[in-house]
Amino acid sequence: MRIRRKKWAREELDNSKFYIDKPEEFKGKWQEKFDKSNPLHIELGCGKGLFIATLASKNRNINYIAVDMIEAMLGLSKRNIEASYDYENPENLFLIRANVEKISEVFDKTDEVERIYINFCNPWPKK
């Protein structure tokens, strides 16, 4: 599936309180980024964010990080997450832009990720 560029995505992400532009700066210290120390779950390849938006809004006692490498998808995720939280900033969820093939640059074993979700990611790398 090819996603068209969303001209508004970059600006909306930059102005979002739950988007992290440089996730590698938090490697090994993700729990410090959240207000509450809860179990940490991550979703790799969050796409439009419908899964993580629903999950995080219903389980506020778990901290979530949604990862995607496509800016347009993160922009759509941001909008879906805001709608799921009645347009308030989530306290238990962050969006980050990262390549899953280089996820070790963003997460460390000291981050103690309890669960990883991978739903319908693209298994065929482009050449």
For every predicted segment, state its role.
Residues 1-42, 50-57, 81-110:
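S-adenosyl-L-methionine
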Residues 44, 67:
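Conserved beta-strand/loop positions that form the S-adenosyl-L-methionine
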Residues 47:
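Conserved glycine-rich SAM-binding loop
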Residues 62-65:
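Short beta-strand element of Class I
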Residues 70:
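Conserved SAM/SAH-binding beta-strand->alpha-helix loop
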Residues 77:
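Conserved SAM-binding loop
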Residues 113-127:
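Mobile active-site "lid"/loop adjacent to the S-adenosyl-L-methionine
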